[in-house]
Amino acid sequence: MPPVVVLIGPPGAGKSTVGRALASRLAVSFEDTDDVIEQRAGKRIAEIFLTDGEAAFRQLEKAVVADRLAAHTGVLALGGGAILDDDTRALLADHTVIYLEVEFSEAVRRVGLNRDRPLLLGNPRAQLRALMDARRPLYEQTATHTVGTTGRTPDEVADEIAALITVREENR
């Protein structure tokens, strides 16, 4: 049985926080593929980027996402860049995928720009803006639903997603 729902979105969208709240509401488990990657690699994502490079990280991410899409039955949050891979996007076509959309200023506030985020090195504000702009079309193309998170609590967002899932299941 596949995940109940898959959450995608940029850093700061609330994938992990909303995912935990949603899993609690649905009485299912929650997994974040970034956590699974770190467990399997035995090191933090930032360290993987520094020691092995982004290409090696993306290969590991692709394998973990494919595995968890096949095996996890709860709420699954993907890392922000997972949708960059064509094969991953193809796998997601068979799932309920929620794009957690967030305004840039809110993402900056949530991420903090001083955190352990390897793709935001250098000028973090400019890097985050470029990353969000480049990935937005892929998030929109991949998602079955888009839910805004700006100015909302994780509980409000989780409630909206739970309602969407219920309606979707009733219409199947």
Swiss-Prot record:
One Gene Ontology molecular-function label: magnesium ion binding
Subcellular localization, as worded in the UniProt entry: Cytoplasm
Cofactor remark from the record: Binds 1 Mg(2+) ion per subunit.
Reaction catalysed by this enzyme: shikimate + ATP = 3-phosphoshikimate + ADP + H(+)
Cofactor(s) for this UniProt protein: Mg(2+)
Keywords from the named record: Amino-acid biosynthesis, Aromatic amino acid biosynthesis, ATP-binding, Cytoplasm, Kinase, Magnesium, Metal-binding, Nucleotide-binding, Transferase
One Gene Ontology biological process: aromatic amino acid family biosynthetic process
PROSITE patterns to which the protein is assigned, alphabetical: SHIKIMATE_KINASE
UniProt keyword annotation of Cell membrane present: no
Residues the entry annotates as binding substrate: D34, R58, G80, R135
GO CC aspect terms: cytosol
Amino acids binding Mg(2+): S16
Pathway(s) per entry: Metabolic intermediate biosynthesis; chorismate biosynthesis; chorismate from D-erythrose 4-phosphate and phosphoenolpyruvate: step 5/7
Enzyme Commission no: 2.7.1.71
CDD domains for the chain: SK (cd00464)
Entry-linked Pfam families: SKI
Binding residues for ATP: G12, A13, G14, K15, S16, T17, R117, R152
Protein family membership: Belongs to the shikimate kinase family.
Function: Catalyzes the specific phosphorylation of the 3-hydroxyl group of shikimic acid using ATP as a cosubstrate.
Oligomeric form and interacting partners: Monomer.
Protein's UniProt name: Shikimate kinase
Gene designation per UniProt: aroK
